[in-house]
Amino acid sequence: MRPRKRFGQHWLTDQQILDEIVAAANLQPTDRVLEIGPGKGALTSRLLPQVEALLSVEIDRDLCKYMVKNYGDRPNFLLLEADYLQTDINEFLGDFPQFQNPRKVVANIPYNITGPILEKLLGTIDRPNSNPFESIVLLIQKEVGDRLVAHPCTKAFGALTLRVQYLADCETVCVVPPKAFYPKPKVESVVVRLRPRPLAQPAQNPKLLATLIKVGFASKRKMLRNNLKSLYNPEILDPIFADLDISPQARGEEVDLLQWIALSDRLNDYPKE
């Protein structure tokens, strides 16, 4: 059985990296875990002995047959043949109470759908996941992983950074070279761990914050003030920027998350143009 390009399949074969992914999940015997895209079960085989229940979601019908043949007799394993992005797993689990409400996620996901999967797992700034996971360990493209953990004033810092860091703490576990996969991808990969959590001081108007971030990074070469002029008069923006110690020449990537939240809270008192 060969990986299918249309599903973005690259199977992880490096045993050390597989062990690092499982270690990063910090599994307990009572854990219920969600695995997205199990492939041929390289991670599955390591997860099953350590958890109470493992729900694996796989879109590839042939791989589902393979997984059922090799793991279908395990009492703590349940396979759902479905597109994770289009499926409400809770609807499927009504007759399987042992697998309901998984609290941890471990997955080697197709790189071309990383953004949508992150959004489904975490929610959005204005609509966060109402039942957040305890931890999410993902193997993703390094370029995207760098953006998740980026700091202000760096090239990787951007809208995705803010959207994810508003909802979760993010850290890099390890870098994964192309040779760790079959077939080899053309890019480096990285294992990241996300721990969803509420902010101590969330935005007063999360929808406005999401809008500001979108507009603020609409043209990264422009100064933030100039991007936001499409929403607010400079007479409103300038004194607020000064109060928040944001330079009039600052670009979006030079403003940290707390400053973005403070900016949103201040602008919440004014109608958009």
UniProtKB/Swiss-Prot annotation:
Cellular compartment(s): Cytoplasm
Superkingdom in the source lineage: Bacteria
GO cellular component: cytosol
Pfam families per record: RrnaAD
Enzyme Commission identifier(s): 2.1.1.182
Enzyme class, first EC level, given as a word: transferase
GO molecular function annotation: 16S rRNA (adenine(1518)-N(6)/adenine(1519)-N(6))-dimethyltransferase activity; RNA binding
Annotated signal sequence range: none
Binding site for S-adenosyl-L-methionine: 10, 12, 37, 58, 83, 108
InterPro entries the UniProt entry points to: KsgA/Erm, rRNA_Ade_diMease-like_C, rRNA_Ade_Mease_Trfase_CS, rRNA_Ade_methylase_Trfase_N, rRNA_adenine_dimethylase, SAM-dependent_MTases_sf
UniProt catalytic activity: adenosine(1518)/adenosine(1519) in 16S rRNA + 4 S-adenosyl-L-methionine = N(6)-dimethyladenosine(1518)/N(6)-dimethyladenosine(1519) in 16S rRNA + 4 S-adenosyl-L-homocysteine + 4 H(+)
Primary site of residence: cytoplasm
Keyword terms of this UniProt record: Cytoplasm, Methyltransferase, RNA-binding, rRNA processing, S-adenosyl-L-methionine, Transferase
Family: Belongs to the class I-like SAM-binding methyltransferase superfamily. rRNA adenine N(6)-methyltransferase family. RsmA subfamily.
PANTHER family assigned to the protein according to its UniProt record, in alphabetical order: DIMETHYLADENOSINE TRANSFERASE, DIMETHYLADENOSINE TRANSFERASE-RELATED
Function according to Swiss-Prot or TrEMBL: Specifically dimethylates two adjacent adenosines (A1518 and A1519) in the loop of a conserved hairpin near the 3'-end of 16S rRNA in the 30S particle. May play a critical role in biogenesis of 30S subunits.
Name of the protein in question: Ribosomal RNA small subunit methyltransferase A
Organism this protein belongs to: Picosynechococcus sp. (strain ATCC 27264 / PCC 7002 / PR-6)
